[in-house]
Amino acid sequence: AASDVYKRQEEVGHGACASAPEDVEELLSVDMGCVGEGLECTDRQVSICVKDGHGPYHYDVVKGLIQAAKDNHIDYAADVYPYYGSDADAALSAGIDARHGLIGPGVYASHGYERSHKDAVAATLELLKAYLA
């Protein structure tokens, strides 16, 4: 059975870590997609993170997300974020043994005056719907 966990804290090592069911099999973190130098994502796309500063995301999750985007003609970019960590990473660090992934709308200026485009938000929602179908 699927479970939803919603949290409002950001990258602080609790929330999803503390409230995920013991038998969780997959974690999909929905955050922001990075936009900037050396990255493929724009502020009009959904970003699928392949790897971040904690290591690679689960191959089958990333592959499934990319395939769902392709099959549904969703504008996406697959990127590596070398200086980033997600709530899914924090959950794995806390000992949760689950497949994990990270997606989000492309966003400029993280932790500043963040800017994105409604197309990126729509693409993120469409990817969520397609992947979870």
PLM features per residue range, with description:
Residues S19-G38, L102:
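A glycine-rich helix N-cap at a beta->alpha junction
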